[in-house]
A protein has these predicted regions:
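Helical element adjacent to the flavin cofactor pocket in flavoenzyme catalytic cores
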Residues: 70-134
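Glycine-/small-residue-rich beta->alpha transition segments that form the dinucleotide
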Residues: 123, 132-144, 169, 199-200
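Generic secondary-structure signature for well-ordered alpha-helical cores
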Residues: 3-14, 43-46, 61, 93-97, ...
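Short loop/edge segments at beta-strand edges and connector loops
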Residues: 52, 100-102, 239
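Alpha-helical packing segments of well-folded alpha/beta enzyme cores
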Residues: 4, 8, 83, 87, ...
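Dinucleotide-binding Rossmann-like beta1-alpha1 core, especially the glycine-rich loop
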Residues: 1-55, 59, 184-185
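A short, glycine/Asx- and small/polar-enriched loop/turn
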Residues: 63-67, 108-116, 170-171, 259
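C-terminal catalytic lobe of FAD-dependent flavoproteins
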Residues: 80, 90, 145-148, 153-162, ...
Length: 264
């Protein structure tokens, strides 16, 4: 993550706000984990510094005043809309053709070699073929379906995640819970709003296009998020989102929390 962090800050700095971040330990958490966290950060060449809780509250007044420990890290927030648009514009300037509202419905093959794709244009309601010397499967959770067109089997682990967009910006630093990954353990500032996330629930693969945020998920996000920043409990919610993480299955992890986020 820190490698990608540094690359994005270099090539897409106009899409990133350098906020820094805090990993806070609450009374119900173990300070032993803080030491493990700092050691792991140093091993990964991440500058992580334990700071006094009172200093943490001066740096980020929205943080829970009951915190008993804090670690400062070089975090930042990405504007995903601006970054996506910038990525598309840069690709087009380098000769790419961008086809929106197009769905891959098959692969063109010559023996064992993939030579292109069959697509369906939803706007013009037509099917046609695109030929290429290299085809990259970057379809996220739908990558399993694309792979099956080539008679390959990749067992995905659909991990649904829900998050809430708050009505205004309540924090200026990214606030994380310093514990093993769990629901609602990160509060992210972004432009004029803050975002609390996320949950992680395994769903059946045939449900990946049927995303709804449940009342139970909203309750969890508000309840746990208020432990990061108490003012969250009184803050208006603008929107609720749900998506599916494109993880590759791991037999020993029913939640998907520990499944690698690396590229397969």
């Amino acid at each position: 993550c820190i490698e990608e962090n540094r690359i994005l800050k270099r090539i897409a700095h106009h899409c990133i706000e350098r906020t820094d971040g805090l990993f806070i330990t609450l009374p119900q958490d173990s300070l032993d984990y803080q030491q493990q966290f700092i050691a792991a950060c140093r091993q990964a060449d991440i500058n992580a510094e334990a700071i006094d809780p009172q200093l943490a509250l001066r740096l980020e007044p929205a943080a829970n005043p009951a915190l008993i420990g804090a670690v400062r890290v070089p975090d930042g927030t990405v504007d995903p809309f601006r970054l996506t648009a910038a990525n598309m514009l840069d690709a087009r300037e380098h000769g790419a053709q961008i086809l929106t509202y197009h769905q891959v419905v098959g692969l063109l093959r010559s023996g064992d070699r993939v030579t292109g794709v069959r697509v369906y244009d939803h706007q013009n309601q037509r099917r046609y073929e695109l030929h290429a010397s290299v085809v990259v499967n970057a379809a996220g959770i739908w990558g399993q379906q694309i792979a099956e067109y080539a008679d390959l089997r990749i067992r995905m682990f659909p991990a649904k995640g829900a998050l809430l967009i708050l009505g205004h910006r309540i924090n200026n630093m990214v606030i994380n819970r310093c514990r093993k990954p769990a629901d609602a353990d990160i509060l992210v500032p972004g432009d004029t709003i803050s975002l609390i996330g996320t949950t992680s629930t395994h769903i059946d693969y045939d449900q990946i296009d049927n995303m709804l945020v449940t009342p139970q998920e909203v309750d969890i996000l508000i309840r746990e998020g208020a432990l990061l920043a108490p003012t969250l409990a009184q803050t208006r919610i603008l929107r609720a989102y749900a998506g599916v993480r494109p993880l590759v299955a791991s037999d020993d992890d029913p939640s998907g929390r520990n499944v690698s986020r690396g590229i397969v």
